[in-house]
């Protein structure tokens, strides 16, 4: 086998692995986000009500900004 065909097979295999890895990771993340959606203001409001707190918009905004800062 000439050297150029070996290099070509290696490059094709590398590209196929990258493409396959991308689609597998994308599918995994879509399933993960579907099962565990990110928290939003409505969910935060319901959690506060369940804990017996009165959810004011100011508290919700503070908690959302704190969570967003923590994620970065």
Curated annotation (Swiss-Prot):
Keywords: Cell membrane, Membrane, Transmembrane, Transmembrane helix. The chain crosses the membrane at residues 3-23. GO terms for cellular component: plasma membrane. It is found in: Cell membrane. The keyword Magnesium does not apply. The keyword Transmembrane helix applies. It holds the Pfam family UPF0154. It is a single-pass membrane protein. Belongs to the UPF0154 family. This is UPF0154 protein Bcer98_2334. It comes from Bacillus cytotoxicus (strain DSM 22905 / CIP 110041 / 391-98 / NVH 391-98).
